[in-house]
Amino acid sequence: METKTLETLKQELDNLFHKFFEDMKIDEKTGIVKDTNKRFSGYPYIGEKYVEAPVKILFIPLDTGSDELYKDNTYHKFDGRIKQITPKKDAKHVFNPHIAGLYATTVCLLKEKLDSAKECWEYLDKAGGKTTSTKINNSWKKLNEEQKNLLSYVAYDNRYKFVTIGRNYKSGGKDRTWLNKDKERELLLSEIEIFNPDIIVFQGKTGLDNCNVKNKEKYTIFKANHPSHYGSGANKLDYIEKIFDKKEGFPKK
């Protein structure tokens, strides 16, 4: 099968979203769903090296934890999502706890495929601090540009596609609901087929339940707690390696 270019991948997803917007009566400009208090939460993140990655990894957390564009009452497309994930040079913390977990999980999955990821994992493992976020902050100045940009090899999406209009807090639990369960699930399944990943990592306790991934045998599927979940220890580096000891099952703390 011919490998898709990044632009082809984006175009196929864009076409899929246009159809979804029509079916759900979503305003293309704002993302607001007609006659509701809900707005489309945004396009998925696609790293610029995803299609050429030695192993294609797709992360699927439950929902967007922070509605970045609530003040503008609109949503991120592909470029906006990239900018949102890219670390700010003057930021006190490199990543928020969720993206820190995403980054460290990416490094773990790629460390047998890329020398840059292997060395990066060693830096993180030796760094001071208990949480993944702290270890990344303490290692960041030692990393080269390739290591800092390892998220460019992966993609991530959300299972739940809508946020409440005007929501200005980070907790995403309120928006783990469906407007049209069948259409939203079909959208996610179609996205997975277009992404055609080698590995899918579902994040959150209900991330994989009842998802009915088509042609599951094509993928290696893992699931884990949300990477910022303190109660499960998911915010620690040693939790990440445990994820991959057990497919489709949660690692123990």
Regions found by a protein language model. Name each.
Residues 1-15, 28, 170-190, 199, ...:
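C-terminal capping/extension of enzyme domains
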Residues 2-195, 199:
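A polyanion-binding, active-site-adjacent surface
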